[in-house]
Amino acid sequence: MFAENNRISWSQMHCQCLLAALGMGLIWGIPEFTGREGAVGILIGGVLLVLWSGILRRQMTVFRDPIRYLGKVPAWLIAGIWESYLVLTGGWLVGKVGHLAGEYLVSGVPETLLSLIFVLAALGGSHHVQARGRLAQISWGVAAWLGGILLLLAAVQNSPSLEMVWGDQHLETTGFDWKRSVKSIGKYVAYGSGIGLMTWLTVQVRDSKEKRRKEGLAPAIGQLSLWFLTGAVLLTVNFGTDATTMNTCPILEVMAGVELPGGFLRRVDLIFLSILLFSLVFLLGSIFFYSNYVADRIHISIGRL
């Protein structure tokens, strides 16, 4: 059904998932998962997402031709739900990025103009399945290494606070809020609900000689959960559970206090922000891509705008 040169590998699928989720998760997601309750929510929520991704992967045959296996009305209904999800997410994202860039990157520029530039940058990316896979594979390697090193520096420089907040003495004197933990599980599962879109694209993942353990989205979900957990711990160390009430971006406030060895670069937060903004551009590009791709799967042609 698909030409071999129009397929991607599981590794490229993982990189697309991680690159698209990283920016939004670290900027707006992790403040909801501070404290031990948030950490438990991430871990249990990650397990639930892995189980759900396994169920979705078994539906690959159905999504090769939804109209054939489900019928026209059910296929259109499912596609309509996902299209609504993409439109709402895209609109929310464009507004948030305009505000973020105006506050942290360039001041004095109208947020509407910044949002427009963001949209044009996302539209300028490749819309071809295989090209997007290669772009994500290369970009994720750079983003993961650079972002990981900066987060590691932040953790090392906050190590005394880490011991104080997560030490045994603190755990003994603080109760565990199970109700908040359950809410965190629900929030994390809701955040990861977008993996359902990957089901539409897995039909174009080629059957190669990759090891079975690389198939499916479980490795990507596991890595993403580690990123969330690291960011949430750093926010807990610096702001406690008050990160959700902050008017600023908590993770960027943490990175603003990070100093590189030798002190040759003082604005580490701008490097970290650049990584996250690139992730957000890729995410919006993915929204445009899937809005057209899902429609194509049910034999409807729509413009990207």
Sequence positions of predicted segments:
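N-terminal hydrophobic signal/anchor transmembrane helix of membrane proteins
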Residues: 1-40, 125-136, 252-254
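Hydrophobic, membrane-embedded alpha-helices of multi-pass small-molecule transporters
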Residues: 6-28, 41-45, 49-53, 82-86, ...
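Membrane helical hairpin/interfacial module
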Residues: 24-111
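Structural signal for the C-terminal ends of transmembrane alpha-helices
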Residues: 57-62, 123-130, 154-158, 202-209
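Membrane-interface helix-boundary motifs at transmembrane edges
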Residues: 63-73, 129-136, 205-218, 296-303
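Small-residue-rich segments of transmembrane alpha-helices in multi-pass membrane proteins
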Residues: 74-83, 139-155, 223-229
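Membrane-interface loop-to-helix entry segments
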Residues: 97, 101, 111-112, 124-154
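Membrane-interface interhelical connector segments
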Residues: 238-269
